[in-house]
Amino acid sequence: MTRPIVADISAAALRHNVAVVREHAPRARIMAAVKANAYGHGVTLCAPVLAEAGVDAFAVASLEEAEALHALGLERPICLLGGPFDADEVSVAAERAYLLVIHEQRQLQWLETRAADAALRLFIKVDTGMHRLGFAPERLPALFAALQRHPRWEVLGLMSHLARSDTPDDPFNRQQAGVFADAIAHVGHVTAGQHSLANSGGVLALPFTHQYWVRPGLMLYGLSPFAGRRGSEIGLQPVLSWRSAVVAIRELGPGDWLGYGAAWQAPARCRVGVVAAGYGDGYPRHLGCGAPVTVAGQTTRTLARVSMDMLFVDLTAVEADIGAPVVLMGAGGPPLESLAAELGTISYEMSCRMQMRVPRRLVS
């Protein structure tokens, strides 16, 4: 018998969320972020659905991710958001016609060494205030003068990243957009005009950041980029439903101890279900003892400590037997955003926690 844990990935929800992007940014092209295995959801399942839904390009974090995506044969441009990490990657990227985001001088030296006469399509990353990656705006004129020595290198546009789009009212968003606009004014005329600034928060709440490309990530998977708000509250549909089942039931008497460390003691007679899911699957260990979980369509809570492969749920008030369905998080269960808040983290991290040993299954 197969271990019952599975991550159901909703094709309908993916299509719906792409439509939400179109609604908010109708004139922009969509570069769908599918890095980190589509934020944990499974790139081999999600990317074909996103392509069918009409996204115009994909964005990944590494050459390895680009190669895995390329193997799917989706005929969409693939953008390496971090550009090449060494000179050897330049040759592969040039052969595959990947879009490269260039953010520092060393990468330009690699291009000169390995692809001086190759046809390349580039974005230039501008540091608009986040101070993570990108060229300072004052360096752009000299940079573009050097780029123009290579007529087969096409600079598609400028790219930058919003640091506080999760708080749309923060004035830093307009400050960054202003720096970006100034950079476009100075060097945009020597690009193809395909600039990009907006991430999910920008798409949903900051229309002044919409350029030729928008780069939604988290929202495609139905998750909210805004603290204190769920995706369902802003018109999105959760793509993930992380499911398992009850594999054993224990009847505890008053004073009986449960789990590792005997960390939980039954205050009265109770019924406990053992679920096939644990921190080895990516379910957070710190969600033991009190986190919401759905069993047989009813909300209950976890008990005691989460083990590597199993966790406990309270079935005292739940009509459920061995084999009863369990939704750990996502559609049909606790919202992932709520569990992330309970842990003091963000939904990005929560969605990326799920391990590869959890099978992903596309459902329509």
UniProtKB/Swiss-Prot annotation:
Which cofactors does this gene product need? pyridoxal 5'-phosphate
Q: Do you know which InterPro entries this protein is assigned to? A: Ala_racemase, Ala_racemase/Decarboxylase_C, Ala_racemase_C, Ala_racemase_N, Ala_racemase_pyridoxalP-BS, PLP-binding_barrel
Question: What EC number(s) does this enzyme carry?
Answer: 5.1.1.1
Residue ranges of the TM segments: none
One Pfam family hit? Ala_racemase_N
Per the entry, what this protein does is: Catalyzes the interconversion of L-alanine and D-alanine. May also act on other amino acids.
User: What is the protein's given name?
Assistant: Alanine racemase
